[in-house]
Amino acid sequence: MNKVDAWLSKHDLKNLTTLIVVGAFILFLILLFMLMNHSDQGSNRITVSENAELRTGPNAAYPVIYQVEKGDTFTRLSKSGKWIEVESRDGSEKSWIAGWHTSLNIEAGANKKVNPLKNKVIVLDPGHGGNDQGASSNTSKKSLEKNYTLKTAKELRRALEKAGATVKLTRSDDTYVSLDDRKLNGDAYISIHNDSLDSPNANGATVYWYKNNQEALAETLNTNIQKKAMLFNRGTRQENFQVLRQTNKPAVLLELGYISNPTDEVMIRNQIHRQVVEEAVVDGLKQYFAS
């Protein structure tokens, strides 16, 4: 009797079959675990389904970090409502994308499809007026801030009304209105100005806010103005202006270029450029109220 025959005679063949079955089952569990782990890793990747924007927070009021294109992929980190937190391309920072722009099959929802400006009351405050002319051009004393803030406000009113908003003006002609009397109720308040310095070198647009509930609107408008307008972007700044201080509503003060700068003055006086800025403001308000 050889060694194999001796071993088989010593051990029950049934036990050998059991060992084989148990071993195969353990191997199956190992393979299943590896497959599930690989699947979990894959599920953390999302694909952008259409051109979109990555933002610093989970709604459209947050500033845009950069644009992404259909087909781009990112690592998913977390979720807030219908917004997905992802790791940026270089892995150095986190950002957010609306879920309906991704492969996660998240619907935007009915609230994203309605007009965000419908039934919204927007207060427009054309700076200065009457005997308060505001800033003036260094080259032409006929170029007065009070005139261009009123032009911009009236043009912006038409654009906002076309978009479904109700608009109030703190002044509708060349009259002086005190700062106290510029306090009107609305869903958002926008004070329109042009900047000026003795030096002709200063240029660009600045968006001011004061209270914490005004910062998101300022960031959103600044982002949209930066995307469309040719004005140098000076960013957003917190400043204790009375028109911002005396309202509890989201409010900003726009300095749309330096009338003391020759290049900015050309853009301030140009209706086409003003319309570009006004469209950016309308887009920003839509974005803000859609969030």
UniProtKB/Swiss-Prot annotation:
PROSITE patterns attached to this UniProt entry: SH3B (PS51781)
Main localization (coarse): secreted
Pfam families the UniProt entry points to: Amidase_3, SH3_3
GO terms, molecular function: N-acetylmuramoyl-L-alanine amidase activity
UniProt region (Disordered), positions on chain: 124-146
Subcellular location: Secreted
Enzyme Commission number(s): 3.5.1.-
Domain SH3b: 41-105
GO biological process: cell wall organization; peptidoglycan catabolic process
Signal sequence region: 1-40
Domain MurNAc-LAA: 122-286
Enzyme class: hydrolase
Record keywords, A-Z: Cell wall biogenesis/degradation, Hydrolase, Secreted, Signal
GO cellular component terms given for this protein: extracellular region; outer membrane-bounded periplasmic space
Chain segments annotated as coiled-coil in the UniProt record: none
The family this protein is said to belong to: Belongs to the N-acetylmuramoyl-L-alanine amidase 3 family.
Functional note: Probably involved in cell-wall metabolism.
The protein's name: Probable cell wall amidase LytH
